[in-house]
């Protein structure tokens, strides 16, 4: 149903967040988990997966990670902070763009990583705290790692006065340090200086991963051009741009392209600015309060497209910008370019809401390249009708009419899709499905309502009516399945739940209770940063057959997201290298160590695995 909505709502996914990109789940299948063989042997300890070294040379600290084949480091999970010392901007290369179903657009390192950390204002007891996290491509993630590096005194003004210390293999210190001394912090996600050597490779990979974004923004721009606030202005705008006198088609084409490039420059700069801000707040964008706030904002923007109220720049600001634009000389390339750049700032009531939504999408992606190109494509789409009018005259433009209001309303439905995409991360699947159904019913109901008022009739009108009816049924089906489906299955879903444990003592207590009851135990180690843990929860544990079998188990879950002292002790107690890890005990209370599962496993092989108990 979602694919149908995306097509018929003209690019519904334009405002989708990076979190919609799906991992290919098959690649995470752990074939070794189909038997009780020890699957833990297939993953190495974190110090072997990401060997870490550092050395200090005067006022510079060099950090070095080697990345084992088949593993990767998260750029967004890498941070460097200082105690009793100030740190400059990190000098490092950007990671490779990577789409994650649960974490959205992230950047990863699959090759050795070198980071240069400038040091300044050394004080007694100075040290640098390095935090990082990585995963195996097979769907196995390590807990966040912390390395504490003591910093030797240095004299920044004398470059050659000190001799570089010997590269040192670091030792882990996973305890969080609560510093009472002055602290400087540098986050990799907000301070990156791309290395010139890898810039081309990074750009190519980014474009390859996001090839559809510019196309959808181009289509969005064309759609905005046909709203009632924009389309009637093109003939007037064309006369202003071209100036007085007759011009050849070639000259008219050139001037119109120059105007559109000026407008595209403004939009591109807007995209770069908000994408830069988005990189700093990318982690915060995942917080439920932020997601709810953004959803309310999108709904507010959508209401303006439905005509509930008018959303635009203050009239005084628009008047000032218009006067500034009118002072430019039409017919000259420089004047036309300036008019285009200024006009990009004049948001009409029809374009303010979609443009705001587009900027929010770009801000959440936190990707400079994608942000700049997407907004450039949006401006080019809006400029296509202007180019057509300038070259061929007004005869190519469709006549103004009620159809333009319908285009505006359609954009309102597209904007309403954005909050559903955002809220899917925090809402139960039942509620997100209900919201999608409600949006589909509203959109296709509106389409059926307006079919009789369309300018054309005959078989085209009938076809639209059929599409609307089919869309209504398709949209309502998921909600109907929840309301009138198999109540027995739904009852099973509500009875499967985990008991949370926080430390070793609570684990021992629950194991003793399960042994007394004669029931096997399953312990799931979970963390919010673990992608495969969320896949287990979404695709495996909610399978009806798996849920039925899990009724025979005592289900325990340890949430180690915060990586506190008690979490580390529990992980060490169970000899857990990373997540996801699932442990089993039989009905006699014996730990079945060779039944351990590491890495994602789909429902069918997981069911075969637990059926052995």
UniProtKB/Swiss-Prot annotation:
<keyword id="KW-0676">Redox-active center</keyword>
<dbReference type="InterPro" id="IPR013766">
    <property type="entry name" value="Thioredoxin_domain"/>
</dbReference>
<dbReference type="InterPro" id="IPR036249">
    <property type="entry name" value="Thioredoxin-like_sf"/>
</dbReference>
<feature type="transmembrane region" description="Helical">
    <location>
        <begin position="431"/>
        <end position="448"/>
    </location>
</feature>
<feature type="transmembrane region" description="Helical">
    <location>
        <begin position="287"/>
        <end position="309"/>
    </location>
</feature>
<dbReference type="InterPro" id="IPR035671">
    <property type="entry name" value="DsbD_gamma"/>
</dbReference>
<dbReference type="GO" id="GO:0045454">
    <property type="term" value="P:cell redox homeostasis"/>
</dbReference>
<keyword id="KW-1015">Disulfide bond</keyword>
<feature type="transmembrane region" description="Helical">
    <location>
        <begin position="215"/>
        <end position="237"/>
    </location>
</feature>
<keyword id="KW-0812">Transmembrane</keyword>
<feature type="region of interest" description="Disordered">
    <location>
        <begin position="166"/>
        <end position="197"/>
    </location>
</feature>
<feature type="domain" description="Thioredoxin">
    <location>
        <begin position="468"/>
        <end position="613"/>
    </location>
</feature>
<dbReference type="InterPro" id="IPR003834">
    <property type="entry name" value="Cyt_c_assmbl_TM_dom"/>
</dbReference>
<comment type="similarity">
    <text>Belongs to the thioredoxin family. DsbD subfamily.</text>
</comment>
<dbReference type="InterPro" id="IPR028250">
    <property type="entry name" value="DsbDN"/>
</dbReference>
<feature type="transmembrane region" description="Helical">
    <location>
        <begin position="370"/>
        <end position="392"/>
    </location>
</feature>
<feature type="transmembrane region" description="Helical">
    <location>
        <begin position="341"/>
        <end position="363"/>
    </location>
</feature>
<protein>
    <recommendedName>
        <fullName>Thiol:disulfide interchange protein DsbD</fullName>
        <ecNumber>1.8.1.8</ecNumber>
    </recommendedName>
</protein>
<dbReference type="InterPro" id="IPR017937">
    <property type="entry name" value="Thioredoxin_CS"/>
</dbReference>
<dbReference type="GO" id="GO:0005886">
    <property type="term" value="C:plasma membrane"/>
</dbReference>
<comment type="function">
    <text>Required to facilitate the formation of correct disulfide bonds in some periplasmic proteins and for the assembly of the periplasmic c-type cytochromes. Acts by transferring electrons from cytoplasmic thioredoxin to the periplasm. This transfer involves a cascade of disulfide bond formation and reduction steps.</text>
</comment>
<feature type="disulfide bond" description="Redox-active">
    <location>
        <begin position="229"/>
        <end position="350"/>
    </location>
</feature>
<dbReference type="GO" id="GO:0047134">
    <property type="term" value="F:protein-disulfide reductase [NAD(P)H] activity"/>
</dbReference>
<dbReference type="Pfam" id="PF11412">
    <property type="entry name" value="DsbD_N"/>
</dbReference>
<feature type="compositionally biased region" description="Low complexity">
    <location>
        <begin position="167"/>
        <end position="196"/>
    </location>
</feature>
<feature type="transmembrane region" description="Helical">
    <location>
        <begin position="407"/>
        <end position="424"/>
    </location>
</feature>
<keyword id="KW-1133">Transmembrane helix</keyword>
<keyword id="KW-0997">Cell inner membrane</keyword>
<dbReference type="GO" id="GO:0009055">
    <property type="term" value="F:electron transfer activity"/>
</dbReference>
<dbReference type="GO" id="GO:0017004">
    <property type="term" value="P:cytochrome complex assembly"/>
</dbReference>
<keyword id="KW-0560">Oxidoreductase</keyword>
<keyword id="KW-0520">NAD</keyword>
<feature type="disulfide bond" description="Redox-active">
    <location>
        <begin position="135"/>
        <end position="141"/>
    </location>
</feature>
<feature type="transmembrane region" description="Helical">
    <location>
        <begin position="252"/>
        <end position="274"/>
    </location>
</feature>
<feature type="signal peptide">
    <location>
        <begin position="1"/>
        <end position="21"/>
    </location>
</feature>
<keyword id="KW-1003">Cell membrane</keyword>
<feature type="transmembrane region" description="Helical">
    <location>
        <begin position="463"/>
        <end position="485"/>
    </location>
</feature>
<dbReference type="InterPro" id="IPR036929">
    <property type="entry name" value="DsbDN_sf"/>
</dbReference>
<keyword id="KW-0472">Membrane</keyword>
<keyword id="KW-0732">Signal</keyword>
<keyword id="KW-0249">Electron transport</keyword>
<keyword id="KW-0813">Transport</keyword>
């Amino acid at each position: 149903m979602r694919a149908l909505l995306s097509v018929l709502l003209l690019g519904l996914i334009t405002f989708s967040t990076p979190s919609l990109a799906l991992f290919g789940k098959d690649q995470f299948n752990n074939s070794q988990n189909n038997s009780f063989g020890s699957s833990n042997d297939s993953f190495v300890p974190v110090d072997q997966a990401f060997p870490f070294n550092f050395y200090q040379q005067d006022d510079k600290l060099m950090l070095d990670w080697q990345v084992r084949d088949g593993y990767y480091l998260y750029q967004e999970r890498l941070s460097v902070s200082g105690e009793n010392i100030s740190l400059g901007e990190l000098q490092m290369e950007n990671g490779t763009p990577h789409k994650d179903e649960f974490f959205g657009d992230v950047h990863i390192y699959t090759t050795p990583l070198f980071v240069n950390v400038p040091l300044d204002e050394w004080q007694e007891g100075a040290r640098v705290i390095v935090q990082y996290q990585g995963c195996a491509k097979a769907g196995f993630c390590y807990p966040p790692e912390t390395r504490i590096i003591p910093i030797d005194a240095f004299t920044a003004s004398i470059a050659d006065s000190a001799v570089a210390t010997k590269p040192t293999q670091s030792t882990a210190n996973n305890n969080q340090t609560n510093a009472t001394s002055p602290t400087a912090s540098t986050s990799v996600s907000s301070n990156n200086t791309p290395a010139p050597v890898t810039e081309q490779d990074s750009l190519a990979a980014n474009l390859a991963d996001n090839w559809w974004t510019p196309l959808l923004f181009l289509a969005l721009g064309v759609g905005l051009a046909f709203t009632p606030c924009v389309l009637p202005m093109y003939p007037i705008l064309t006369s202003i741009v071209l100036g007085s006198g007759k011009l050849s088609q070639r000259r008219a084409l050139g001037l119109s392209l120059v105007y559109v490039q000026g407008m595209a420059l403004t939009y591109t700069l807007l995209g770069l600015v908000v994408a830069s801000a988005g990189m700093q707040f990318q982690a915060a964008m995942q917080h439920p309060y932020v997601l709810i706030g953004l959803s309310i904002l999108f709904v507010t923007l959508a209401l303006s497209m439905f005509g509930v109220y008018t959303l635009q720049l203050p009239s005084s600001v628009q008047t000032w910008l218009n006067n500034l634009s009118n002072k430019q000389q039409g017919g000259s390339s420089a004047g036309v370019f300036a008019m285009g750049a200024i006009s990009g700032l004049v948001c009409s009531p029809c374009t303010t809401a979609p443009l705001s939504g587009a900027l929010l999408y770009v801000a959440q992606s936190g990707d400079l390249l994608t942000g700049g190109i997407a907004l450039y494509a949006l401006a080019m789409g809006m400029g296509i009708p202007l180019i057509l009018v300038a070259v061929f005259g007004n005869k190519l433009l469709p006549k103004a009419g009620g159809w333009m209001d319908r285009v505006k309303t359609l954009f309102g439905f597209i904007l309403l899709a954005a909050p559903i995409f955002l809220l899917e991360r925090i809402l139960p699947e039942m509620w997100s499905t209900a919201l999608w159904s409600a949006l589909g019913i509203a959109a296709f109901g509106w389409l059926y309502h307006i079919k009789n008022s369309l300018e054309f009739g005959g078989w085209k009108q009938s076809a639209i009516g059929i599409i609307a009816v089919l869309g209504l049924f398709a949209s309502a089906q998921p909600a109907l399945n929840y309301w009138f489906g198999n109540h027995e299955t739904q009852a099973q879903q509500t009875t499967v739940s985990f008991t949370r444990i926080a430390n070793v003592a609570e684990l021992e207590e629950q194991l003793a209770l399960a042994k007394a009851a004669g029931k096997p135990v399953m312990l799931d180690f979970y963390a919010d940063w673990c992608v495969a843990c969320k896949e287990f929860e979404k695709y495996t544990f909610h399978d009806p057959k798996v849920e039925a079998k899990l009724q025979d188990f005592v289900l325990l879950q340890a949430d180690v997201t915060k990586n506190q002292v008690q979490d580390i002790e529990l992980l060490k107690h169970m000899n857990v290298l990373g997540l996801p890890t699932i442990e089993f005990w039989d009905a006699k209370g014996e730990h079945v160590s060779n039944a351990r599962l590491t890495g994602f496993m789909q429902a069918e092989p997981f069911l075969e695995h637990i059926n052995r108990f």
